[in-house]
């Protein structure tokens, strides 16, 4: 690898072969894997997330697995903070950070940074709400046009919640919401080699998704979800339970879907997720594409990383 302080990222839709490639690379490079997956963070959710096995985790150190209970939340800002700290720690120990996953919101937070918007202030919000009742929404929207015309143009005049929030941000920060949104913080500044793994033909990805879903159902996945279903503190609106596969099995256990309906909807939802992932990847700069199943994939990655990261990322 040419750039010694570089980070490697392997993107890809679900069931594309990211895990296999990452483990193969770890045999050649002294890597530690940082999971970039919003479902793998949860304890007790192993089968439906295709979590790396204990054997795989023993072969290569994995990070950001099993760090939250399913009742808890984990934001893109949480990931950004944790990933940056892990990257520094891994490199300080002389190893290579390898980011692997398909949660594109997390990747975006890490690579582009996040906007730091002020938290809601009760006193400011109460004052603005009182003005809303006294002067009306049109007056507040007119005020927003003066201090933040871009937000005023974007926000519908009949949307009180967003108008109040935009004015609240301006009063707290002294800057318009538009300006604060453009200001990004916490982005990765180290060189990065980015690879995306996906089949050339969509039907191949669909076949792999269906095979993975059926493999999941052949394991005690129903029992895994039943354990979650039995917990009184969990409900279907939590991010953990909304995860693809878990949502549909939860509905099956609740009597809302038959087994066949659960399977069909789970496969469709996984395909839709993969489509969103592919759409994001096609628009992301600096990504080098690899075809799922290419026997020379690992060698192509190693060859590509002989270039300086700056040159690597300048190519389409």
Swiss-Prot record:
Q: Which domain of life is it from?
A: Bacteria
Q: Fetch the SUPFAM superfamilies from UniProt.
A: P-loop containing nucleoside triphosphate hydrolases (SSF52540)
Residues the record annotates as the site (Interaction with substrate tRNA) are 103, 125
EC class, as a word, reads: transferase
Give UniProt keywords alphabetically: ATP-binding, Magnesium, Nucleotide-binding, Transferase, tRNA processing
Its quaternary organisation is:
Monomer.
Q: Locate the transmembrane regions by residue number.
A: none
This protein's name: tRNA dimethylallyltransferase
Matches recorded under Gene3D superfamilies: 1.10.20.140, P-loop containing nucleotide triphosphate hydrolases
- A GO biological process this protein is involved in? tRNA modification
User: Gene name on record?
Assistant: miaA
Positions bound to ATP? 12-19
Binding-site list for substrate: 14-19
Q: Name one GO molecular function term.
A: ATP binding
- What family does this chain come from, according to its entry? Belongs to the IPP transferase family.
